[in-house]
């Protein structure tokens, strides 16, 4: 099979990369009614599979789970989760032939096997759903022409999808119809009903394309969302310890610092995050972020280029075929780093202390968010898509580090995201070591003293922060998310 994106001509590639429309709430007036009375069969009962299924059932849809015979016979975790929540569970052969919509929510590396197994069982005119388009775009999976192929991609982990639904809200969502598979012209109606059933329409829905979702998703998770957090954690911890900071304190400052800092980002963008600093610290964080952007821009561009060309995907799929040798080696090496093995700090760090002593971390967040956004937009991805795949998801990923450091982040994210994270962080850490060696007192681990600042310089920096395109689009999109619960700030 050929990478689907690479079979398109340039005009088609640009059209699909640039497909992005914020949908009005009136477009979801019918809710999930298009799928009511139809049979929806979910394949896979992980975080997205279970939580989307719970939401869809609560929205009045007929939901069941198709699992492999071995998973049922051995009563594996997927079987237990589905049955304990009262869902009907059966084998592919038992459930797929009756399904009007088959939703594939298995891990990326399983998609080809799953799709090749279920396709012959699907009835004529049924629909196949994804929450990530890697199998269609990067693998180039060929789907029977009578089958409608749609995507509903919540921009949050599965647990968040469920929690926001229970509060009567939802999470921002991308929806798409594969242009090669919409034989009856009903793809958008199916996708809208599915998105409404998960609650996504209450937080904002972008009509996108499989191509735009995949390319922007890969870029975000490899760079700012995971790779930058991992590289930043390792670099900052080593720098603090090198300068005499207690390893336990250094570990907590970083582990909980990302979440505390990005909570401000979630509530008010880069502007609010920077406003949490004193004026001298803000000027220093801005200067550091500009240096970081200059150093890291070629690395961000290389990742985007490799994603667009398919180089990244072909390399990762080769590792799949080699039993994940690279992935597992990188995972093991990460687990042995000084940051991951440092002792726990039992004392309390106040909220403002994370900002005052984390100026470099704030600069890293600002630089990474802006670079990821700018690089995606320069590649033809629309600003709204770039925002969701950079700034919006960052607090959610930072929240995973609080639980069990980088180990937890890499467990929660997909194997695809984890592989890309390691590619980025393994390149970024050595790239930034000369920069780290030139840091000044107060950049990390110590607060910058209060002092006089130049009014004109402060005015210009504030204007530069607030006028960045990601701040403009972010203000609009956050207006749809004002009801989202506040992620608990670390204590």
From Swiss-Prot:
Q: Name one GO molecular function term.
A: magnesium ion binding
| SUPFAM superfamilies xrefs | 6-phosphogluconate dehydrogenase C-terminal domain-like, NAD(P)-binding Rossmann-fold domains
The KARI N-terminal Rossmann domain is annotated at 15-208
Catalytic machinery residues: 132
Q: Which UniProt keywords apply?
A: Amino-acid biosynthesis, Branched-chain amino acid biosynthesis, Magnesium, Metal-binding, NADP, Oxidoreductase, Repeat
Its recorded reaction(s) are: (2R)-2,3-dihydroxy-3-methylbutanoate + NADP(+) = (2S)-2-acetolactate + NADPH + H(+); (2R,3R)-2,3-dihydroxy-3-methylpentanoate + NADP(+) = (S)-2-ethyl-2-hydroxy-3-oxobutanoate + NADPH + H(+)
What is the protein named? Answer: Ketol-acid reductoisomerase (NADP(+))
Organism whose genome encodes this protein: Shigella flexneri
